[in-house]
Regions:
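Helical element adjacent to the flavin cofactor pocket in flavoenzyme catalytic cores
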Residues: 214-222
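A short, structure-level motif marking secondary-structure boundaries and short turns
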Residues: 1-2, 48-50, 161-164, 222
Length: 222
């Protein structure tokens, strides 16, 4: 039996360990902390508990598939409660603010209908535009999850296949989020709302491949 050592007990390390053990390997996971590490970490002090991991539960289909791969139903282990609104965006020095106001707050819901009046106030026709934007986002998400995300990239040449080149154009991997969003929305506020997800990547919209617009489908469509 082959043995494998995994450094770090975050979700990546734990999932890798589970798949390797299922495949017949003897697996040992090493973690420097007293509790699970990375995004799976938990801080407990004075009777309080803080999740040290992700603030969003993204790509629920991936989590469900992981449990299914081991013959388990994810809903037997966790119960999810959807937040509404999902998040609040703070706009500073926005034009056309009421007298005496120096900022604007926008609550964003995963329920598109609840966003309608707010988005339309920010940009006329925003909801119709958003429907087109999300339809494209859903298509790109489905293509990415079917053809690219599950693939192993063992060599740099794996990135230069004919399929990668042709589908890459459709997935907008050669443009950035800033220019992509501007094609659809004209108001700075709507542009920032659609680019909000980029903060989780720790980079600027101009430096982020437009492929990441798939996060809008995850946000509003899942």
């Amino acid at each position: 039996m082959h043995t494998v050592a995994i450094i770090g007990s975050g979700f990546g390390g734990l999932s890798a360990a589970a798949y390797l053990a299922q495949a017949g390997y003897k697996v040992t996971v090493y973690e420097k902390n007293k509790q699970l590490g990375g995004r799976a970490s938990l801080l407990e002090d004075s009777g309080f508990r803080w999740d040290m991991g992700p603030s969003w539960y993204l790509m629920p289909d991936v989590f469900a598939q992981f449990f299914a791969d081991f013959g388990k139903d994810i809903h037997e282990y966790i119960t999810l409660t959807k937040l509404d609104p999902s998040y609040r965006i703070y706009f500073k020095d926005t034009p056309d603010l009421p007298t005496g106001r120096d900022h604007m707050l926008v609550d964003v819901s995963s329920d598109l209908e609840r966003n309608s009046s707010v988005f339309e106030a920010l940009e006329s026709g925003a909801m119709a535009t958003l429907e087109r934007y999300l339809a494209r986002s859903q298509y790109q998400y489905e293509v990415a999850m079917r053809d690219f995300v599950p693939k192993n990239y063992d060599s740099v040449f794996d990135f230069f296949t004919w399929k990668m080149m042709t589908e890459g154009v459709k997935l907008n991997v050669f443009s950035n989020m800033d220019s992509y969003v501007r094609r659809y929305f004209s108001s700075p506020e709507m542009q920032k709302i659609m680019q909000y997800h980029v903060v989780f990547l720790g980079t600027a919209p101009k430096d982020t491949p437009a492929l990441y617009n798939i996060m809008s489908h995850i946000d509003f469509g899942m």
